[in-house]
Amino acid sequence: MRFLPVFIILLLLIPSAPSVDAQPMTKDDVPLSSLHDNAKRALQMFWNKRDCCPAKMFCCQW
């Protein structure tokens, strides 16, 4: 029981710790937002093609 408050305090401190990613960007780094947008676009294309069939050609976006 004595360790419970210490454990809770440690759990609260973990998210506020400095991140390892907090380093200056170099010219070769890609922003995470760009990677997120690319993944979102790829998933959207996959979703559109998943429901595509010859009977529903109007839904296909090639």
Curated annotation (Swiss-Prot):
Protein family: Belongs to the conotoxin T superfamily.
Protein name per Swiss-Prot or TrEMBL: Conotoxin Lt5.3
Domain of life: Eukaryota
GO molecular function: toxin activity
Propeptide: 23-48
Major location (coarse): secreted
Domain commentary: The cysteine framework is V (CC-CC).
Keyword Disulfide bond among record annotations: yes
UniProt signal peptide: 1-22
Subcellular location: Secreted
